[in-house]
Amino acid sequence: MRRSFIGVFALIALSLVATACSTDEGERLIAIRASVDPAVGDERFLFAVNEIDGTRRGSPEEAVTVEAKALDAPDTVYEVEADFLWMVPGSIGLYRAAIPFDRSGQWEIDFSVSTGEPTQPFLVLVNEQPSTVAAGDVAPRVATPTLATTEPEDLTTDYPIHEPFYTLSLDEALDNGRKTVAIFATPAFCTSAACGPMMRQTKEISASYPDVNWVHVEVYEGFNDDGFAPDLEHLAPAVVEYRLPSEPWIFVMDEAGTVVSRIEGVLAEGELEALLDT
C-alpha cells in the first residue's frame, strides 16, 4: 500500500500551525518536530526551534537541553543535550536529541535554550514499530535503475550525475557480501531543503569507503515524462518497499543485507562514518 508522503519542511509547517494554535503565549519559543517516524528504540529525534511568528531559530551557538517523558510514566524523565545540525550550511538547521524512547504512546518534550527565553513543551506520538523498514530487518531486495539499464538523464535529478552511485542495483548490492548505503533522495523535487545537502555529503564520504556499496535511489520514476507530477503514483518501487513517509532517508546495511541503521532528514558530521567503521 502506498503511504502518504511528506517532507521535513511540510511537517514543520503543519506542526507550527498546530503548536501556534495551542498556546496564546506569543513570547515563547516553540519546537517543531522534524522526525516523521519516531518509534520505540529510536535515539535520534530531530526538531526545529521557531519563534511563534514562524521566524526560524537555531545555531551551534544556541545550546538546547531537552527533557522528555512518557505521559504514562511521568516520573521517568530523560534529560539530554541536543546538538545542532546544519541542513543548509549557514542558513537552516535542526536540533538532534538522543532521546531513549523506551515505550510507545504520547511523550512530552520540553526544552530550554541557552538564551534563557521561555519555551513551549510539545507532544510526540511514539509508535511501537516504525513505519519504515527498521534496524534488524532484512533489507528488501528491490531492483533499482543503473547506468547499464537506464539513460543517465533518467536515473537521477542530481546533476552532474555521480556515476559510482548507479553501478549496482540495490538488490545486487545487498547480496554481494559488502556493506551497503542506500540514499533515498530527490534533489529536484525535495519537499525539504535536505536532499541536495545529503547527496553532497554522501558523495564526499563515499570516496573514503570504496569497499562499501553506494546506491542512490531517486524517489520518483518518470520525472522526464510529459505530465509527470511528484506524487504517490510516481513513487519508485524501492521507496514503496521501504515504506518511506518522507525524504530524504539513508539506510545502512551490513554484509548480510540486514538493516543496521536508518537516518532521516539530515546527516551529522561523522555519523555515517561511525556506522561504517564498526
Feature annotation, model-predicted:
Residues 81-113:
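Ligand-binding face of N-terminal immunoglobulin V-set domains in extracellular IgSF glycoproteins
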Residues 42-55, 64:
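Beta-strand-rich structural segments
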Residues 217-247, 252-259, 269, 275-278:
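Thioredoxin-like thiol-disulfide oxidoreductase module
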Residues 116-172:
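N-terminal "domain-start" segment that seeds a small globular fold
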Residues 22-24:
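Bacterial signal peptide processing site
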Residues 162, 170-191:
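Short active-site neighborhood of thiol/selenol oxidoreductases, capturing the structured segment around
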Residues 192-208:
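Typically the conserved alpha-helix immediately C-terminal to a functionally engaged Cys/Sec
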Residues 17-20:
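C-terminal motif of bacterial Sec signal peptides marking the signal peptidase cleavage site
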